[in-house]
């Protein structure tokens, strides 16, 4: 049974790799869009299966496509922005992926290399935090705030900020504002 599970995991990793673009982006399907959240999910699946170099390629794509404000656009097609909305859940999820990558590889150098990307992503989301603590969902393509906090996105954002705090501690950095 264990061998069957290992074969299944490897076949899924092989499928993800077969979809990955040379840039590191992992679209939903061949010729489809890439969204930052799913790209990180796929990178974590690659880490889980031991395909670390392909996971690093996906994380580097995240670093290379991050907007100056720390966000990512909601979708890309062949590495070009397609949907210009900016989701706070997408901007923080890189921290979850990087924490998982570190746990599976213990590669502190890569964690340090990716830190600016993680930090900017979390700071983008926190820039939309409201006095009550909720973090608004995102910005429209015209940079207008989308008021409201969706439960699933908020849960992912909360987990990602916690992962970012763990990364900061491992890098001996202090991010007290992230605990608010």
Identify the residue ranges that each predicted region occupies:
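Generic alpha-helical secondary structure signal
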Residues: 3-14, 53, 108-112, 116, ...
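Alpha-solenoid helical-repeat scaffolds
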Residues: 6, 32-36, 85-91, 108, ...
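Active-site beta-loop-alpha junctions enriched in small/polar residues
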Residues: 39-40, 77
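The feature captures the catalytic groove of carbohydrate-active enzymes
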Residues: 14, 21, 25-28, 74-75, ...
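Helix-terminus loop motifs that line ligand-binding clefts
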Residues: 50-122, 126-129
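Well-ordered alpha-helical scaffold segments within catalytic/enzyme domains
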Residues: 1-2, 40-54, 93-110, 156-173
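Low-complexity, Ser/Thr/Pro/Gly-enriched N-terminal "stalk/linker" regions
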Residues: 1-37, 48-72, 125, 132
